[in-house]
Design a protein with these regions (language model features):
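Aliphatic-rich helix starts adjacent to a transmembrane/signal segment
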Residues: 3-5, 11-64, 68-70, 391
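N-terminal pilin/flagellin-like segments and related low-complexity appendage regions
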Residues: 59-315, 321-372, 388-391
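Structural signal for terminal/edge beta-strands and the immediately following C-terminal loop/tail
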Residues: 375-391
């Protein structure tokens, strides 16, 4: 070995060699970091898709389960769709609707409050729990205030604490919801005592008078099982207000997170009156996001229109928990187009009414297009609509 080579070896690496080694090391670290980052991004995307699938399925299962029971105990033509006077000491309120431009609170299987400009709807579904279904009796004497409802028959199926609704038989005027405080005898006729402050619903007198022999009293079952449910989406969370979910009926309890939209449509049976017989089955002839004059009586949102609702079409949109990174141009392409629902013709031959959604979440600084979404749709027949008395 020459003396020059030996001297170079003893001197160690040159500056150029050290710099080349550092560059190679940095490139290796950068490559490994990029691999780990891409792997983590893929993992988050996969987990986010799984989360949105689970959240969406749970949300749809919960809402559709309510829809299957909607209208139980409310399917009598005298009661279904009646504008109802209602107060609750725990704060629950009936859904507001319009009847030819006048505000009402109808008691029906389902009431949709449409969200403006593609924003989420509010879907309310009502159901009683009386074991006998539509338990009813007739008011015998005029009710002009007070806490006694004298009836014309023994109160079979009624119990203290049951929720009742008093309705005019001619369908004119409002109904009133109350709660049974006692079952008593008044002379030769049995009577229902109401207006007891120990009970939750309408602790005072009814807010209107009712004519004897021309008004019915319907039993909706016990207070604990009264299923008045309002579904809504707020701040990217599916929430539920309910009469049978804790002591606070006004509170909207969280059910599923990363739910950004809830949409619903009525499925109306539009057959002529001569052909309309719910006991022989209901059929959807028209979908609508808002209430219409389905029975052609000249009144939009009347009781007859709610009695023409054969099914509900429901859509839920779930969002991935983690947004994806924008492209080199700063634009996200995870969801490049607006989300639309209800675009397919179901049942066959019925024109769809497609709806474009606004899935933006209030106060979320991330562009909505940076998230991935899953849409869930279903149609739920209101089976209780066909199981109604005709006399």
């Amino acid at each position: 070995m020459s003396s020059r080579a030996q001297a170079r070896r003893m001197a160690g690496f040159s500056l150029v060699e050290l710099m080349v080694s550092i560059v190679i090391g940095l490139l290796a670290v950068l490559f490994a970091t990029r691999m780990m980052t891409d792997s983590e991004t893929t993992k988050r995307g996969a987990l986010g898709g799984s989360d949105s699938m689970q959240n969406g399925m749970m949300a749809m299962f919960s809402i559709s389960g309510d829809a299957e029971q909607a209208g139980y105990g409310l399917n009598d033509p005298i009661l279904n769709g009646c504008d109802t006077l209602f107060t609750d000491n725990s704060g629950y309120a009936l859904a507001a609707a319009s009847r030819d431009g006048v505000g009402v609170t109808p008691l029906a299987a389902a009431v949709i409050v449409p969200g403006a400009d593609g924003k989420p709807d509010q879907l309310t579904m009502y159901a009683g729990s009386a074991p006998g279904g539509t338990c009813t009796t007739r008011l015998l004497t005029n009710y002009i205030g007070g806490n006694q409802l004298v009836v014309d028959r023994p109160l079979y199926g009624f119990a203290v604490g049951d929720v009742i609704v008093v309705a005019p038989e001619n369908g004119e005027g409002k109904c009133a919801l109350a709660q049974v405080a006692a079952l008593t005898g008044q002379g030769a006729a049995p009577a229902i005592s109401i207006g007891d402050v120990r009970y939750r619903y309408n602790a005072g007198a009814l807010a209107r008078n009712f004519d004897g022999s021309a008004s019915r009293i319907f039993n909706l079952g016990g207070e604990a099982n009264l299923s008045f449910h309002t579904w809504l989406v707020r701040d990217g969370v599916l929430r539920l207000r309910a009469t049978n979910l804790g002591a606070d009926g006004e509170a909207a309890h969280a059910v599923a997170d990363n739910i950004v939209s809830l949409k619903a449509q009525y499925g109306f049976d539009k057959r002529d009156a001569a052909d309309f017989d719910p006991e022989l089955g209901m059929q959807v002839g028209e979908w609508s996001s808002a209430m219409i004059d389905a029975d052609d009586d000249g009144v939009t949102g009347g009781p007859g229109d709610y009695q023409r609702v054969a099914a509900l079409r429901i859509a839920v949109v779930a969002r991935a928990k983690t947004p994806e990174r924008p492209g080199a141009d700063g634009v996200c392409t995870a969801q490049p187009q607006a989300i639309k629902v209800f675009g397919s013709a179901q049942p066959q031959g019925v024109d769809p009414v497609e709806v474009e959604l606004d899935v933006r979440v209030e106060d979320d600084p991330v562009d909505w297009r940076c998230y991935r979404y899953r849409t869930f749709e279903t149609i739920v027949p209101l089976r209780n609509a066909g199981w109604r008395p005709t006399a």
